[in-house]
Swiss-Prot record:
Name by which UniProt lists this protein: DNA-directed RNA polymerase subunit beta'
Annotated function: DNA-dependent RNA polymerase catalyzes the transcription of DNA into RNA using the four ribonucleoside triphosphates as substrates.
InterPro entries in the record: DNA-dir_RpoC_beta_prime, DNA-dir_RpoC_beta_prime_bact, RNA_pol_asu, RNA_pol_N, RNA_pol_Rpb1_1, RNA_pol_Rpb1_3, RNA_pol_Rpb1_3_sf, RNA_pol_Rpb1_4
Matching SUPFAM superfamilies: beta and beta-prime subunits of DNA dependent RNA-polymerase
Biological process terms in GO annotation: DNA-templated transcription
Gene Ontology terms for molecular function: DNA binding; DNA-directed RNA polymerase activity; magnesium ion binding; zinc ion binding
Domain of life where this protein originates: Bacteria
Record organism: Shewanella sp. (strain W3-18-1)
Family: Belongs to the RNA polymerase beta' chain family.
Length: 1405
């Protein structure tokens, strides 16, 4: 019997498919799916529980209720399979057909499908070129529409109200035809001749001038073409037949007590059937028009509710006032089909339990409770018991397991040996959230976890739970062992650094072991070997921290892998000598001969991995952990209240600060400072007092005075427990110690502003009521933030994964010569990220030369590993062009060379690696560590903003970047260009620091001059913006009339008078058109020219400019003609943290973006309008001028007559990524986004490799805008995938035709995800209805390229181990499509072949 069923199951072969197509269903197609018409709204007979005939659950239509049994019970058993009972008409088959057989309802009047009507833009509306309002009025029987105008003056598609319709009837009689309702729309749609319309529109397009009209026609044309090419007919958007979902997918379940639980769909279907039957009856009775119309409208509404409840009008509600769940609601949203069931399936063979520490485990092990193991491995145990002959049947085996007989445990031991299990902790934010371990059976009920993997899981033991999953098949076990084993995941995929670094107690133990103490017991002893040190420590002759001399033996591994031993005597401590015992052979003792903090340990593990490989590192990590735990125990470090030593200086420092605050308060009361200045100064005073206190406290804590062997006092690092914990990186930080033993400091209100009275007490002294109350603000904000942050961070990760999920490495090398230029990142004067960190693991795109020569140092296509990076540093290279995924030329994927090294494995990336998902996880996972808030610039933060000079930190020579300058009368350089930068170069030409210098900066040194560290080399006034003269001569005021365009003001203190230019708004009518300026005249009174140009030297003065010169005064080059006061930049909120990252990836336009020059040329200002000024750029080559209106209040960086380059900043502000892409190109926008995102993460101390951000940027740049179509079938202004255009252009160029031209477009991640070619992926992301509507209209076919689509259809994903499967399938498919070439063999050839074969056979005898 069982075999028979198995045989039957095999008959239904699964179809091999290569894609999924979605389209509109024609009425005939719907009827062909159906197994019968549902005519009655009844569901089941409430007495007998049997389905009603011709009802919604009818067994005759949908299949039997019990397996192989008809409804009336005449035929039972399998032997009648396929018989149709003549009594009840039910086919004898399996019940599961009730999940797949559909029915249908023949609608008495056509009904519009709400998705094509209401989902914007309305497809029916576009098709008929009518507005949605008009169509709705027709559909819901409010007005008539003309279908056939005949010989009348009416037009097709014209709307007629009831009155106008009657008038027309009187006038024309039956010359014309007008109808209402869906029938009317159906006829209009049916009358459209697609081919003709498309042709007409294509001809019409080039001649359309109005932008909006052109857009509309293009949209309509696209829709028509979609219908035309897909073979969909427009009239199918109106339903004549409604399909009925199989009954088991909308179940009706009897509850106890005679009530029923039912799916909402049954209610919705019942409504439709009731109204449909009533309408049929009314039509048969030939009822009055108005009644029929009303019924038709109600039918339309009930079908709308069934398809998408609540889209039009009020949602239909059930008995409990809850809107009914329609078909559309079933598939969309988090609880919908896509996300709940297709992407988030549950698995069997899993369990979960609380986790505890397993300090004795090895890195590849986890402790599994026996109870859990027994349950998880049950089938394996049954099989083993039966195979051993210990149990005769499965039933017997079951009994044995239930009784927990002794043999069962032995069998269990065997079963789990070498059978890895997977442990997962939710939330799984990156791929290290699931790892495989070998189980070790333990007593108890908690899973034991190895402490070193906690960092990857972000787990702690305060009640966290973890899930265990068992890989069943051999392939799954193999993957778990080879790819997911915790020992294979030592490096983090986000930054390539070890992720299994010890933390907390282990760090403290190792740090304690490696510290030295002056005059410790045994100081000065000398040992012949480490073994001897061990003895001395064990016997107590020398203590752990004693400074001793030891002869050590080191193993040195040469480049060829040859090992040589070397002995030397080192000064070290007993503890460090003991640590050298666990150091793997091949590592230098110097690595542990230092204070081992968390950073040092991490570096040690990293070095070990790079030099000795995986196996040694894993063993070493375990040893480090055991040692750390051991010595942490021995150290006895603890936190006591006396450990928080309050510095004596604290009280005087606080008193001084209070005195200063009082002084400021007095100044404020006498009116010398404003309220704002007072507040800022007070906050500055307290901030610096806090710094001083904490400095004194740390000095006090971190050192202690001891007497050395010679009886002299000496300072040494203290052994204070709290200090050791913070210093080693085990727990706590200077900031936290400051709150314990210094002062709590300034606090913020809930709105983010700083309270000006700080908490001067610390936690050891205790807080008073007021201080405690102020503290609660911060604490509560922290909690609220955390909750918000988690949700936001999760949503960002989801969007990132969605945009990048289909990006996979598919070839070795795309051969491109493009790349991104990498330089060290320099901010202010510090190198934030050296070049080696930016290029490590990348591939060189353009040969790197030795500095100053033509010899190649690193040839193109070199993978830069650690050794190469050392070489680059040696030769002080400060710029390398590396390959990047942004410039990769591979279609529908990327190549290994453009990606470079797989960070988690340390070698070049493998084919099939899902780099998109890895990138998304690497960016999203630290999201929860980022802050949520927007920072107000105020108080302490505003000090840094008013810089007014450059003080260099390194010696070297001075170099200027894109700077124009003039030399003033003192022989100093004055900068007269905008975005100038100044750099300090060392003797090898490497850039050490770089600063932005504003217009009007005076340089103390000339270019190329030598500077010393600490020199101040540039000065400027941060509060005003000067206008610098570039020529010497006498000045002439133009249009400067007192009281009309300017006023004179006299300074009360100095008595000097100055001229202030009035703003245009403040001038009378006479002054409105005047343009005040200063002209420079030569000795003979003629205009002077700006050197090197034909432009006369005249400087326009904007409103509120201050001039301190008199008419006809003589001036020199580089003098300031006028000063424009800068408004103290309004306290703008800086968006920081997570929202900033989201803004960057969504490519949102900032509020007031910087204005960039659209073309290169000369600036001039045209006629001003109210509130705006007209900026005109005239290109040098005499092309078209570019005009732009700019609001008056924008601070412009340019003056009339200045030359600008395309993409240069004209008005300050945050730059918009779209502008950067348009005006400065793809490389600049990539650098901009990478650097901005990295700034946010760097602030939080999170390391992410640049290439992950680049992967996301590549996906944001996936689409392009067609600027001219050439001979392609694209439309101008259409948005197309770049790969598609490139492929099409390649074919066209090969044929000698005109290729299309395009502009790259930057889409935000949400937009890019929805614009993907795969409609399945887009629909499962967001806006399901819109995506599916669009796809259906276009008859789209999903080629299942990405990961998500394949998960949804239940296939292996085309990445990782599934990549090979997909590759072979695709190759086979390509082969099948190739024309078969038959090689004809000539006679002589055939003879020769035969002879060869015979010879071969002969030679083998």
């Amino acid at each position: 019997m069982k075999d028979l069923l198995k045989f039957l199951k095999q008959q239904s072969k699964t179809e091999e498919f290569n894609g999924i197509k979605i389209g509109l269903a024609s009425p005939d197609l719907i009827r062909s799916w159906s197994f019968g018409e549902v005519k009655k709204p009844e569901t089941i007979n409430y007495r007998t529980f049997k389905p009603e005939r011709e009802g919604l659950f009818c067994a005759r239509i949908f299949g039997p209720v019990k397996d192989y049994e008809c409804l009336c019970g005449k035929y039972k058993r399998l032997k009648h399979r396929g018989v149709i009972c003549e009594k009840c008409g039910v086919e004898v088959t399996q019940t599961k057909v009730r999940r797949e057989r559909m029915g249908h309802i023949e609608l008495a009047s056509p009904v519009a499908h709400i998705w094509f009507l209401k989902s914007l833009p309305s497809r029916i509306g576009l098709m008929l070129d009518m507005t949605l309002r008009d169509i709705e009025r027709v559909l819901y029987f409010e007005s008539f529409v003309v279908i056939e105008p005949g010989m009348t003056s009416l037009e097709r598609g014209q709307m007629l109200t009831e009155e106008t319709y009657l008038d027309a009837l009187e006038e024309y009689g039956d010359e014309f035809e007008a109808k209402m309702g869906a029938e009317a729309v159906l006829e209009l749609l049916r009358a459209i001749d697609l081919a003709k319309e498309i042709e007409q529109m294509r001809e019409e397009l080039p001649s359309i001038n109005s932008e909006t009209r052109r857009k509309k026609v293009t949209k309509r044309l696209k829709l028509m073409e979609a219908f035309f090419t897909s073979g969909n007919k427009p009239e199918w958007m109106i339903l004549k037949v409604l399909p009925v979902l199989p009954p088991d997918l909308r179940p009706l379940v009897p509850l106890d007590g005679g009530r029923f639980a039912t799916s909402d769909l049954n209610d919705l279907y019942r409504r439709v059937i009731n109204r449909n039957n009533r309408l049929k009856r009314l039509l048969d009775l030939a009822a009055p028009d108005i009644i029929v119309r009303n019924e038709k409208r109600m039918l339309q509404e009930s079908v709308d509710a069934l398809l998408d409840n609540g889209r039009r009008g009020r949602a239909i509600t059930g008995s409990n006032k809850r809107p009914l769940k329609s078909l559309a609601d079933m598939i969309k949203g988090k609880q919908g089909r896509f996300r709940q069931n297709l992407l988030g399936k549950r698995v069997d063979y899993s369990g979960r339990s609380v986790i505890t520490v397993g300090p004795t485990l090895r890195l590849h092990q986890c402790g599994l409770p026996k109870k859990m193991a027994l349950e998880l491995f049950k089938p394996f145990i049954y099989g083993k018991l039966e195979g051993r002959g210990l149990a005769t049947t499965i039933k017997a085996a079951k009994k044995m397991v239930e009784r927990e007989v002794a043999e069962v445990w032995d069998v269990l031991d065997e079963v789990i040996r070498e059978h890895p299990v997977m442990l997962n902790r939710a939330p799984t934010l990156h791929r290290l959230g699931i790892q495989a371990f070998e189980p070790v059976l333990i007593e108890g009920k908690a899973i034991q976890l190895h402490p070193l993997v906690c960092a990857a899981y972000n787990a702690d033991f305060d009640g966290d739970q973890m899930a265990v999953h068992v890989p069943l098949t051999l392939e799954a076990q193999l993957e778990a062992r080879a790819l997911m084993m915790s020992t294979n995941n030592i490096l983090s995929p986000a930054n390539g650094e070890p992720v299994i670094t010890p933390s907390q107690d282990v760090v403290l133990g190792l740090y304690y072991t490696s510290r030295e103490r002056i005059n410790g017991r045994g100081e000065g002893m000398a040992f012949m070997s480490v073994a001897e040190v061990e003895k001395a420590y064990a016997t107590g002759a020398a203590e752990l921290h004693a400074r001793v001399k030891v002869r050590i033996t080191e193993t040195i591994i040469g480049d060829d892998g040859e090992r040589t031993e070397q002995r030397r005597i080192v000064d070290t401590t007993v503890g460090r000598a003991l640590l050298s015992l666990i150091l793997p052979a091949g590592l230098s003792f110097d690595l542990v001969n230092q204070n081992m903090g968390k950073k040092q340990i991490s570096k040690l593990l990293n070095t070990c991995y790079r030099q000795l490989g995986l196996k040694d590192t894993v063993i070493f990590a375990d040893q480090l952990m055991y040692t750390g735990f051991r010595f942490a125990t021995i150290s006895g470090a603890s936190v006591g209240i006396d450990d928080m030593v309050i510095p004596d200086e604290k009280y005087t420092l606080v008193a001084d600060a209070e005195a200063e605050v009082l002084e400021i308060q007095e100044q404020f009361q006498s009116g010398l400072v404003t309220a704002g200045e007072r507040y800022n100064k007070v906050i500055d005073i307290w901030a610096s007092a806090n710094e001083k206190v904490s400095k004194a406290m740390m000095e006090n804590l971190s050192t202690e005075t001891v007497i050395n062997r010679d009886g002299v006092e000496e300072k040494q690092a203290s052994f204070n427990s709290i200090y050791m914990m913070a210093d080693s990186g085990a727990r706590g930080s200077a900031a936290q110690i400051r709150q314990l033993a210094g002062m709590r400091g300034l606090m913020a209100k809930p709105d983010g502003s700083i309270i000006e009275t700080p908490i001067t007490a610390n936690f050891r002294e205790g807080l008073n009521v007021l201080q405690y109350f102020i503290s609660t603000h911060g604490a509560r904000k922290g909690l609220a933030d955390t909750a918000l942050k988690t949700a936001n961070s999760g949503y960002l990760t989801r969007r990132l994964v969605d945009v990048a999920q289909d990006l996979v490495v598919i070839e070795d090398d795309c051969g491109t010569h493009e790349g991104l230029t990498m330089k060290p990142l320099i901010e202010g004067g510090d190198v934030v990220e050296p070049l080696r960190e930016r290029v490590l693991g990348r591939v060189v795109a353009v040969d790197v030369f030795y500095p100053g020569t033509e010899d190649v140092l690193a040839p193109r296509n070199t993978l830069l590993d650690e050794a190469w990076c050392d070489k680059l540093e040696e030769h002080s290279i400060d710029e390398v062009i590396v390959r990047s995924v942004i410039t990769c030329d591979t279609d529908f994927g990327v190549c290994a060379a453009c990606y470079g090294r797989d960070l988690a494995r340390g070698h070049i990336i493998n084919h099939g690696e899902a780099i998109g998902v890895v990138a998304a996880q690497s960016i999203g996972e630290p999201g929860t560590q980022l802050t949520m808030r927007t920072f107000h610039i105020g108080g302490a933060a505003s000090r840094a903003s008013a810089e007014n000079n450059v003080q260099v930190k390194n010696s070297g020579s001075l170099k200027l970047h894109n700077a124009k300058h003039v030399t003033n009368s003192d022989g100093k350089l004055v900068i007269v260009s905008r975005s100038s930068e100044l750099a300090i170069i060392d003797e090898l030409g490497r850039e050490k620091e770089r600063y932005k210098v504003p217009y009007g900066t005076v340089l103390e040194k000339l270019e190329e001059a030598a500077v010393e560290a600490g020199d101040i080399i540039a000065n400027w006034d941060p509060h005003t913006h000067p206008i610098i003269s570039e020529v010497a001569g006498s000045i002439k005021f133009v249009d400067m009339i007192d009281g009309v365009t300017m006023t004179r003001q006299t300074d009360e203190l100095t008595g000097l008078s100055s001229i202030v230019i009035l703003d245009v708004g403040q001038r009378g009518t006479a002054g409105k058109e005047m343009r005040p300026m200063i002209r420079l005249l030569g000795a003979n009174g003629s205009d002077l020219m700006i050197p090197g140009t034909e432009v006369p030297a005249q400087y326009f003065l904007p409103g509120s400019a201050i001039v301190n010169l008199d008419d006809n005064a003589q001036i020199a080059v580089g003098d300031a003609l006028a000063r424009i006061p800068q408004e103290s930049s309004k306290t703008r909120d800086i968006t920081g943290g997570l929202p900033r990252v989201a803004d960057l990836f969504e490519a949102r336009k900032p509020k007031e973006p910087a204005i960039l020059a659209e073309i290169s040329g000369t600036i001039s200002f045209g006629k001003e309008t109210k509130g705006k000024r007209r900026l005109v750029i005239t290109p040098a080559d005499g092309g078209d001028q570019y005009e732009e209106m700019i609001p008056k209040w924008r601070n412009l960086n340019v003056f009339e007559g200045e030359k600008v380059e395309r993409g240069e900043v004209i008005a300050d502000g945050p730059e918009a990524a779209h502008d950067i892409l348009r005006l400065r190109g793809i490389h600049n926008v990539a650098n901009y986004i990478v650097n901005e995102v990295q700034d946010v993460y760097r602030l939080q101390g999170v390391k992410i490799n640049d290439k992950h951000i680049e992967v996301i940027i590549r996906q944001m740049l996936r689409k392009c805008l067609i600027t001219s179509a050439g001979d392609t079938e694209f439309l101008e202004g259409e948005q197309v995938e770049v790969s598609r255009v490139k492929i099409a252009n390649r074919e066209l160029i090969a044929q000698g035709k005109v290729p299309a031209t395009f502009e790259r477009e930057l889409l935000g991640i949400t937009k890019a995800s929805l614009a993907t070619e795969s409609f399945i992926s887009a629909a499962s992301f967001q806006e399901t209805t819109r995506v599916l509507t669009e796809a259906a209209v276009g008859g789209k076919s999903d080629q299942l390229r990405g990961l998500k689509e394949n998960v949804i259809v239940g296939r292996l994903i085309p990445a990782g181990t599934g990549y090979a499967y997909h590759k072979t399938r695709n190759d086979a498919r390509a082969k099948k499509d190739e024309p078969v070439v038959v090689n004809k063999v000539t006679a002589s050839e055939a003879e020769q072949n035969l002879a060869d074969l015979l010879n071969m056979a002969g030679s083998q005898d």
